[in-house]
């Protein structure tokens, strides 16, 4: 984790640029995050927080942090920017309740293809989720943001949790 911090400290300009990016999503992350975490995917329009989340064929979300005001109506669009079909490189968005174990959830859901990789035994840990989409597809869901706090979101497609979570 600390390996990503020394590089920006060696160069003045990137450090200042990074600082500007960190100010955009108001509260700071408790742990260092990859550069893509700086991508602001939330746009508040009136009473609705619009979230534009992207996933690709490299098993990456375009961010690993989403900040929305507690209780705000959320309209989240997951867009698969890759080309591979859902059967081989499908992605979904699953927002788990506070305290839920993302790894355990993903492991339990690996065989739940018919329910978009959300197993019946762990469905009660989900706040909101999308269906699985393939390359070039997108899906939009609406839900109310939970109480203030930190929540795990992930792609539960088999093998994706390790690199597709935030």
PLM feature segments, named:
Residues 43-74:
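N-terminal edge beta-strand
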């Amino acid at each position: 984790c600390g390996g990503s911090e020394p590089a920006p400290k060696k160069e003045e300009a990137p450090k200042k640029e990074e600082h500007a990016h960190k100010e955009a999503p108001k509260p700071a992350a408790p742990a260092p995050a990859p550069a893509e975490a700086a991508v602001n995917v939330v746009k508040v329009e009136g009473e609705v927080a619009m979230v534009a989340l992207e996933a690709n064929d490299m098993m990456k979300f375009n961010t690993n942090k989403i900040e929305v005001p507690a209780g705000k109506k959320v309209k989240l669009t997951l867009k698969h920017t890759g080309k591979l079909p859902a059967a081989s490189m499908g992605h979904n968005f699953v927002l788990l309740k506070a305290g839920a174990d993302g790894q355990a959830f993903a492991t339990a859901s690996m065989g739940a293809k018919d329910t978009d990789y959300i197993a019946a035994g762990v469905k009660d840990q989900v706040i909101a989720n999308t269906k699985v989409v393939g390359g070039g597809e997108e899906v939009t869901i609406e839900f109310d943001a939970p109480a203030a706090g930190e929540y795990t979101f992930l792609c539960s497609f088999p093998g994706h949790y390790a690199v597709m979570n935030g």
